[in-house]
């Protein structure tokens, strides 16, 4: 109450921010007459004037009023569009390292031109980040005339572009591209073998469109570049045959409940748990198939990989559904993005899950992959000097933006007041009743000439609604991952009178729905339209536009609630743009996933009390509140998962930064001989110390062991025992010096043969290759550590602290291995003539190119990472699922080391 009162008196933080910025808007408006007087050339010359002022030490911030006034005037001349005052406010918010919440239809694309131009003046580059290639291309081409008029270059960064084209795109003042492509380029740059192979510049300013989709929805999914591992496709096929024999039961066995099935599914945690009976049956079937020996346990350490295959196959059958989580196209399993409903071509699930789904669908199984490099979006975007974003719906996630990215959210007012009617939810008992009610609503609305947009959460649901509409004889368009090639065309005409459009998640569709359809799209469809044709198209559009306004604008139907209120708001936001009328309503049933998992008992209890009849709906504030609470629960759970992931990834991130900094320094220098000499000293000191402990008696020295080690690991034949016999005065220190001096001498002789330049080149190559190889192994080891670390909680230890401690120890060990491997490789190398070295380098490049083509870019869902390393030493004794776990945690085996992810 007190907070409300104080807000009324002093205004909220949002109001105060906008009040401060409105003063600058007045300044920009005051400059307008002055800018109008300038000729085109004088206006263009402003860019160089601003650049010169920045070079002399003026700050970018001090140029805001003038620079924004220049962009507004240029936009009037190039596009015939003048930035509204609210768009100027949005531009300032974006320059202020904040997130601008701007409603759909308020012109976010035009708003972005202001901070993009301003921040490009410093010459360090601006990255505009969009959710898909289509939008990156569209926005770049749409804004190119404006930026080029002002003397700015524009680049587009698309997947599959050759490196020179990418380098050119990044060298431009303003670069458009997708979040994935920027992230993958960063990883690829840190795998480059020469400075010329890198494409990105230093990361300066990122302007993220649909920022909630990129920084929140996709934050749980790391970007991964992986290379091929060993082939195990036959095993996936064999295990896949076994799974259909298993029967699912409703809930997990417990002291009070014993089911009849073989496994249970925890939908909330997306996990599958084998029952005691299931385990026995699987072991019998594995023995029958000849995969496992009789009397063996699936949980014995030797069967860890087999357990991994069984887990993956179970999850593929029980948790992943065709046309919801993936589609099968041209004999390939393609993932469907759960947030946007788009297909993710070339992406693969990790941990063998993709192969298990391929086996289930009977398509060709592709090899498993090994991680070569990975980063989360959270850590990638935090590398930018300056970060800002815009979206139609950020306010519900303001806390997360602030706590993780240190970004404040500012709600920018709309240019015209919003008059859309958001009707209360209707809840039905069954899915069929709900679909029927939706069809009736569509019939009623289209009879009045009102266009309808139906939002569904999966391809499967969109096809169910489509079939029912076809039965009812209602013409409609379907927009889902299967047909998104003609997506923009469908969206552009979704505002036609009585048009019906079904769409999977509308997040990130990026095209406004114009009431009466898009006359621009009709003009674009004609080859060489005359003035009369254009005038006629506009006149026809005006008639349709007025008819749709009279019918009540665009009506939105949601077929079920999403996990996040934000995505519901995005769907609603497609209607009522720029002060247009519109309406929206969500239809729900007790069979919807969200209701079933999170809100079922309470709401179905209410419905029974109210004595519902088939076909009847409940419309009550209590129900709406219960649903909002369910969504809040899911949102906070997802936030916790993302925060947890980030805390763990921060550990890896510090190491990644250290390795990448070291690697880039290596790339940028041509001579690493000083480094090599320094680490050679360290390596020989540590090697000698292992056999001749410092300050020890001669009886404790293992001279033969040292000679053997020097021969095997460094290819050095040294008669140390003979030296000691002949020269009694040789002591520990002088012996060390002699061994080191001899090793340097042998190395210098090799250098004389091939020449110093070739040797420097070779040293650098060895260091880079060794670093990459060890980093790859380190990433795999970190993955294993991460999967089993939660079990430390049973020993009253904080898993996060343990993870930090152990991963640091592993990192330190990796750096020691790096030194040892580099010196060992350089010592063992057989010297050849320069021509042969050149040929070997050529061979290495060809091999690198071949591997690059085999690399997979994936955007793996980390929630689904397989848990619990099953290396518990269970011995020969078979452990019951409900027995105490032998690790001593006090938990049941099935809930500890016997737990299936």
Swiss-Prot record:
May bind 1 zinc ion per subunit. One of its GO terms (cellular component) is plasma membrane. InterPro entries: Helicase_ATP-bd (IPR014001), P-loop_NTPase (IPR027417), SEC_C_motif (IPR004027), SecA (IPR000185), SecA_CS (IPR020937), SecA_DEAD (IPR011115), SecA_motor_DEAD (IPR014018), SecA_preprotein_X-link_dom (IPR011130). Transmembrane segments: none annotated. One of its GO terms (biological process) is protein transport by the Sec complex. Induction: Repressed under conditions of excess protein secretion capacity and derepressed when protein secretion becomes limiting. This is regulated by SecM. It is found in: Cell inner membrane; Cytoplasm. The gene is secA. Part of the Sec protein translocase complex. Interacts with the SecYEG preprotein conducting channel. Has a central role in coupling the hydrolysis of ATP to the transfer of proteins into and across the cell membrane, serving both as a receptor for the preprotein-SecB complex and as an ATP-driven molecular motor driving the stepwise translocation of polypeptide chains across the membrane. ATP binds at residues 87, 105-109, 512. It is a peripheral membrane protein. Belongs to the SecA family. This is Protein translocase subunit SecA. Its cofactor is Zn(2+). The lineage of its organism: Bacteria, Pseudomonadati, Pseudomonadota, Gammaproteobacteria, Enterobacterales. NCBIfam families: PRK12904.1 (NF009538), secA (TIGR00963). Its main location: membrane. Zn(2+) binds at residues 885, 887, 896-897. It comes from Salmonella paratyphi A (strain AKU_12601). Monomer and homodimer. Part of the essential Sec protein translocation apparatus which comprises SecA, SecYEG and auxiliary proteins SecDF-YajC and YidC. Keywords: ATP-binding, Cell inner membrane, Cell membrane, Cytoplasm, Membrane, Metal-binding, Nucleotide-binding, Protein transport, Translocase, Translocation, Transport, Zinc.
């Amino acid at each position: 109450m007190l907070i409300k009162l104080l807000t009324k008196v002093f205004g909220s933080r949002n109001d105060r921010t906008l009040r401060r910025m409105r003063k600058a808007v007045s300044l920009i408006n005051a400059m307008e007459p002055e800018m109008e007087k300038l000729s085109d050339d004088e206006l263009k010359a402003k860019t160089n004037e601003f650049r010169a002022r920045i070079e002399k030490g003026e700050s970018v911030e001090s140029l805001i009023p003038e620079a924004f006034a220049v962009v507004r005037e240029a936009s009037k001349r190039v596009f015939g569009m003048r930035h509204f005052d609210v768009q100027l406010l949005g531009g300032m918010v974006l320059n202020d390292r904040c997130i601008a919440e701007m409603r759909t239809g308020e012109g976010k694309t035009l708003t972005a031109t202001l901070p993009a131009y301003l921040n490009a003046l410093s010459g360090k580059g601006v990255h505009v980040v969009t959710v898909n290639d289509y939008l990156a291309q569209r926005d770049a081409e749409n804004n190119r005339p404006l930026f080029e008029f002002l003397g700015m270059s524009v680049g587009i960064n698309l997947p599959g572009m050759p490196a020179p084209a990418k380098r050119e795109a990044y060298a431009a003042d303003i670069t458009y591209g997708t979040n994935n492509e920027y992230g993958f380029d960063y990883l690829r740059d840190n795998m480059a073998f020469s400075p010329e192979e890198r494409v990105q510049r230093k990361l300066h300013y990122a302007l993220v469109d649909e920022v909630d989709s990129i920084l929140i929805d996709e934050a749980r999914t790391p970007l991964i570049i992986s290379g091929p591992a060993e082939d195990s496709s036959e095993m996936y096929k064999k295990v896949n045959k076994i799974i259909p024999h298993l029967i699912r039961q409703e809930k997990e066995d417990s002291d009070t409940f014993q089911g009849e099935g073989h496994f249970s599914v925890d939908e909330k945690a997306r996990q599958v748990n084998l029952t005691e009976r299931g385990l026995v049956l699987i072991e019998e079937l594995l023995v029958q198939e000849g995969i496992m020996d009789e009397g063996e346990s699936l949980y014995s350490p030797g069967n860890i990989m087999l357990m991994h295959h069984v887990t993956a196959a179970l999850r593929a059958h029980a948790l992943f559904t065709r046309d919801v989580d993936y589609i099968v196209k041209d004999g390939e399993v393609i993932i469907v993005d759960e947030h946007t409903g788009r297909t993710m071509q070339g992406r693969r699930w990790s941990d063998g899950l993709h192969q298990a789904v391929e086996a289930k669908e009977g398509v060709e199984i592709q090899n498993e992959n090994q991680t070569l490099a990975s980063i989360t979006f959270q850590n990638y975007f935090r590398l930018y000097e300056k970060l800002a974003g815009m979206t139609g719906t950020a306010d519900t996630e303001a806390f997360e933006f602030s706590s993780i990215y240190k970004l404040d959210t500012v709600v920018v007012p709309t240019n015209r007041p919003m008059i859309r009617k958001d009707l209360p939810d209707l809840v039905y008992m069954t899915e069929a009743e709900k679909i029927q009610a939706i069809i009736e609503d569509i019939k009623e609305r289209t009879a009045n000439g009102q266009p309808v947009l139906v939002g569904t959460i999966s391809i499967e649901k969109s096809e169910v609604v489509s079939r029912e509409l076809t039965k009812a004889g209602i013409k409609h368009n379907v927009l889902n991952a299967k047909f998104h090639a003609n997506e923009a065309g469908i969206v552009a005409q979704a505002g036609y009178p009585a048009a019906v459009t079904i769409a999977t998640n509308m997040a990130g569709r990026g095209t406004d729905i114009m009431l009466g359809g898009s006359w621009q799209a009709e003009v674009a469809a004609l080859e060489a339209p005359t003035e009369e044709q254009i005038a006629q198209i506009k006149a026809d559009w005006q008639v349709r536009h007025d008819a749709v306004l009279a019918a009540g604008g665009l009506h939105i139907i949601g077929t079920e609630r999403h996990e996040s209120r934000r995505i519901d708001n995005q769907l609603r936001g497609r209607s009522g743009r720029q002060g247009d009328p519109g309406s929206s309503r969500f239809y729900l049933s007790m069979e919807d996933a969200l209701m079933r998992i999170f809100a079922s008992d309470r709401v179905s209890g209410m419905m029974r009390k109210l004595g519902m009849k088939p076909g009847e709906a409940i419309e009550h504030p209590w129900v709406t509140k219960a649903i909002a609470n369910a969504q809040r629960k899911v949102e906070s759970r997802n936030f916790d998962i993302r925060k947890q992931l980030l805390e763990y990834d921060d550990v890896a991130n510090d190491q990644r930064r250290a390795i990448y900094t070291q690697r880039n320094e290596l790339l940028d220098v041509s001579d690493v001989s000083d480094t090599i000499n320094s680490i050679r000293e360290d390596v020989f000191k540590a090697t000698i110390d292992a056999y001749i402990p410092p300050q020890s008696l001669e009886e404790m020295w293992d001279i033969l062991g040292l000679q053997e080690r020097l021969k095997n690991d460094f290819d050095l034949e040294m008669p140390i025992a003979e030296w000691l016999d002949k020269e009694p005065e040789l002591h520990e220190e002088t012996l060390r010096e002699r061994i080191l001096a001899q090793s340097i001498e042998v190395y210098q002789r090799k250098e004389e043969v091939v020449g110093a330049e070739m040797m420097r080149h070779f040293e650098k190559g060895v260091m880079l290759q060794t670093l990459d190889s060890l980093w790859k192994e380190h990433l795999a080891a970190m993955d294993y550590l991460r999967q089993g670390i939660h079990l430390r909680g049973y020993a009253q230890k904080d898993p996060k602290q343990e993870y930090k401690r152990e991963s640091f120890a592993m990192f330190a060990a990796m750096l020691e291995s790096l030194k040892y491997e580099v010196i060992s490789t350089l010592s063992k190398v057989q010297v050849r003539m320069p021509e042969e070295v050149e040929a070997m380098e050529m061979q290495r490049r060809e091999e690198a190119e071949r591997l690059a083509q085999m690399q997979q870019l994936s955007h793996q869902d980390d929630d689904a990472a397989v848990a619990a390393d099953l290396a518990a030493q269970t011995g020969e004794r078979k452990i019951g699922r409900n027995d105490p776990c032998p690790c001593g945690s006090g938990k049941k085996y099935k809930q500890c080391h016997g737990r299936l992810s």
